[in-house]
């Protein structure tokens, strides 16, 4: 690790952040909405469910994509995108044909295979590594428990199983390190409604440390990551992004950070816990619940969130909706509707309604969610923008033009800061407004 500050082009420098290891620091002032830097993906992989609607190469969303002539499972904008993606796609093309229905490596395995291929094709430093090289990634190997090590060994076995014909592997120890690095430093690419599009490696973006009061936000333009200021940043200030969903109270956020990234956050929000009381709001009753009843309900809420996360993989929508409704009923006896655990289950219920195309049901949940979301999340939150966007599109689908108009404009106002005024998503939403 280089401990001295290394100046970089464009008003930013890598430096040794006290107590945090490496970090990124501003050398000049940045205004809200200003682009600090962009970073092309070192490598990226489109999620299987988005094949056919997004280009496997550049992730552009469009109609009429062309199929790969061999496997017929990858889709591209044109010959250029296909040629550019071939060094990566060839790892999977023949294997998908050979394995047929049995071809099912996880996205992490697919991404890691691409990293190995990229390192072989392009061993020198890339345009994605101006500040931080992939080989410098933290792995936190010493902090992995047996369960995490076992999951990594499963991934290594899958890598050998699905990719053995087209790759040379480093030894097992090196693969353990690489998978641990990917787990801590990989990014998920999402669209404007926060639907999952794929996974990618953005080395320079991974240099930024975490805060629950971030001063920048990361968005994506295809496979390009862009980092914009959501607060004014002064020269000498460290640049912080958020690694996690910021809806939840301090204890939950830090549980998540410890589990995934092996540290506890000491930002202002985690120290002062100013938002926790609102986030855990209790229903005002003549006979208020005891502290023990509240503790028990929080425990129940955390369990039901985990139960639902698992159930999503195998239960039908009707049963998933039932889990949401029953848990909301039970929690509602103690929690206010604006309590984050209530909001979590409402959001899941809204997702089920959208899936089964129950637009009215989805709208009812969304209307309950949006105000508390705006309060609990920081300014210019993608979660708030995507909720306004979903609401706007639902209103439009249900012929409520004035409400749709208003909601879509609220989404645009946030996105112009977070995504930049010229982002294709914003042009698409403006077109939706004109077309209705």
From Swiss-Prot:
What's the Enzyme Commission number for this chain? 2.1.1.-, 2.1.1.354
| Residues annotated as binding S-adenosyl-L-methionine | 20-22, 140, 209-210, 261-263
- Keywords annotated in UniProt: Chromatin regulator, Cytoplasm, Metal-binding, Methyltransferase, Nucleus, S-adenosyl-L-methionine, Transcription, Transcription regulation, Transferase, Zinc, Zinc-finger
Q: Where are the zinc fingers (MYND-type)?
A: 55-93
Which residues does Zn(2+) 2 bind? 68, 71, 89, 93
Job of this protein: Protein-lysine N-methyltransferase that methylates both histones and non-histone proteins, including p53/TP53 and RB1. Specifically trimethylates histone H3 'Lys-4' (H3K4me3) in vivo. The activity requires interaction with HSP90alpha. Shows even higher methyltransferase activity on p53/TP53. Monomethylates 'Lys-370' of p53/TP53, leading to decreased DNA-binding activity and subsequent transcriptional regulation activity of p53/TP53. Monomethylates RB1 at 'Lys-860'.
- Protein name, per record: N-lysine methyltransferase SMYD2
What is the protein's species of origin? Gallus gallus (Chicken)
Provide the gene name from the record. SMYD2
């Amino acid at each position: 690790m280089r401990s001295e500050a290394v100046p970089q082009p464009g008003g930013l420098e890598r430096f040794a952040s006290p107590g945090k290891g490496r970090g990124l620091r501003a050398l000049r002032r940045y205004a809200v909405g200003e682009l600090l830097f962009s970073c092309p993906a070192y490598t990226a992989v489109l999620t299987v469910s988005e094949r056919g609607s997004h280009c496997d190469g550049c992730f552009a969303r469009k109609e009429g994509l062309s199929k790969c002539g061999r496997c017929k499972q990858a889709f591209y904008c044109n010959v250029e995108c296909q040629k550019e993606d071939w060094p990566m796609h060839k790892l999977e093309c023949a294997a998908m044909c050979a394995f047929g229905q049995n071809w099912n490596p996880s996205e992490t395995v697919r991404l890691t295979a691409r990293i190995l291929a990229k390192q072989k094709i392009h061993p020198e430093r890339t345009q994605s590594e101006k500040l931080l090289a992939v080989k410098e990634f933290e792995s936190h190997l010493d902090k992995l428990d047996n369960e995490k090590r076992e999951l990594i060994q499963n991934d290594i076995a899958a890598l050998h199983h699905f990719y053995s014909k087209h790759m040379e592997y480093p030894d097992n120890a090196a693969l353990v390190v690489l998978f641990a690095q990917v787990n801590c430093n990989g990014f998920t690419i999402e669209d404007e409604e926060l639907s999952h599009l794929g996974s990618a490696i953005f080395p320079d973006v991974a240099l930024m440390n975490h805060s629950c009061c971030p001063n920048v936000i990361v968005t994506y333009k295809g496979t390009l990551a862009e980092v914009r200021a959501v607060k004014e940043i002064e020269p000498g200030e460290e640049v912080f992004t958020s690694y996690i969903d910021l809806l939840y109270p301090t204890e939950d956020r830090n549980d998540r950070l410890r589990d995934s990234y092996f540290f506890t956050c000491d930002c202002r929000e985690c120290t002062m816990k100013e938002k926790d009381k609102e986030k855990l709001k209790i229903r005002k009753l003549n006979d208020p619940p005891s502290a023990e009843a509240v503790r028990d309900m929080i425990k129940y809420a955390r369990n039901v969130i985990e139960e639902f996360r698992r159930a999503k993989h195998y239960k039908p929508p009707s049963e998933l909706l039932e889990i949401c409704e029953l848990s909301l009923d039970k929690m509602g006896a103690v929690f206010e509707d604006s309590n984050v655990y209530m909001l979590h289950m409402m959001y899941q219920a809204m997702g089920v309604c959208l899936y089964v195309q129950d637009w009215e049901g989805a709208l009812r949940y969304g209307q309950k969610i949006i105000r508390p979301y705006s309060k609990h999340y920081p300014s210019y939150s993608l979660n708030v923008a995507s909720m306004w966007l979903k609401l706007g599109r639902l209103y439009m689908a249900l012929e409520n033009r004035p409400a749709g108009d208003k909601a879509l404009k609220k989404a645009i106002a946030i996105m112009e800061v977070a995504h930049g005024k010229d982002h294709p998503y914003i042009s698409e939403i403006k077109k939706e407004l004109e077309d209705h």
